[in-house]
C-alpha cells in the first residue's frame, strides 16, 4: 500500500505544493526561494529516506516568514496524510545527531496529539544568509500542528548557527523515519492501547 501524501495550500501570501512518499529512497526536489530552508528540507528528505517534492511561491518581497511557515504547515499535513491509519508502524522514534561542535537530540511520537518541546543554545546568530534562525522553532510548531505528533527537540550545545539548525533537521529526519517505518512484528496492529491514534 502506497504511503504518499500530497497537499496544496494557496493563500494571498503563498502557493505551496508538497508531496511526500514515506517509503521512498530520499529523492528530493525542493524550491521555496529560501536557500537555507531548501537545504534543510533536502536534509529531511535524504536522511529520512522520504521522496519529497516541495514547490512554494511566496511573498519574498516582504520577507521569508510566510513562505517558510506555509511550507511547514503543508509538509505537516502531507506527512499526516501519508501516515494513513498508522496500523503496523513503530510509532516512536528518536535520534541523536552531531554536526561538528553541535548536537541535536530528537524524539517523536506519532500520537495524534500535537505537542512541541524545543530547546537550543541561547545567543545564536540571528541570520544564516536570508534565513532568520528564530524560524526553526516556528517551522517545528507548524509541522507538529498539522502532522499531529509529539516532538521533542533538544540541542544541548553548539556554536555555529548553521550547524545547530542543520543537526536538528537531520535528527528529525531519522526520528521520523524510524517512527513511521512498518514494524514487521506488528503487521495489522495499531500501536496504541486506546485503539486509536
What are these regions (language model features)?
Residues 1-197:
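Structural preference for solvent-exposed beta-strand-turn elements
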Amino acid at each position: 500500500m502506497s504511503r504518499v501524501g500530497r497537499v496544496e495550500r494557496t493563500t494571498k501570501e503563498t502557493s505551496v505544493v508538497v508531496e511526500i512518499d514515506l517509503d521512498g529512497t530520499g529523492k528530493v526536489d525542493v524550491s521555496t526561494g529560501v536557500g537555507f530552508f531548501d537545504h534543510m528540507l533536502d536534509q529531511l528528505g535524504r536522511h529520512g529516506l522520504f521522496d519529497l517534492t516541495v514547490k512554494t511561491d511566496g511573498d519574498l518581497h516582504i520577507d521569508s516568514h510566510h513562505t517558510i511557515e506555509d511550507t511547514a504547515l503543508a509538509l505537516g499535513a502531507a506527512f499526516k496524510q501519508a501516515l494513513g491509519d498508522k496500523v503496523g508502524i513503530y510509532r516512536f522514534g528518536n535520534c541523536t545527531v552531531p554536526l561538528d561542535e553541535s548536537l541535536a537530540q530528537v524524539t517523536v511520537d506519532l500520537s495524534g496529539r500535537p505537542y512541541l518541546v524545543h530547546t537550543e543554545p541561547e545567543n545564536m546568530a540571528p541570520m544564516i544568509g536570508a534565513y532568520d534562525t528564530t524560524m526553526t522553532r516556528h517551522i517545528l510548531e507548524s509541522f507538529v500542528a498539522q502532522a499531529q505528533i509529539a516532538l521533542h527537540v533538544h540541542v544541548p550545545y553548539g556554536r555555529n548557527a548553521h550547524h545547530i539548525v542543520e543537526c536538528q533537521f537531520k535528527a528529525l529526519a531519522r526520528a521520523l523515519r524510524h517512527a513511521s517505518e512498518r514494524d514487521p512484528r506488528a503487521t495489522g496492529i495499531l500501536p496504541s492501547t486506546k485503539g486509536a491514534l
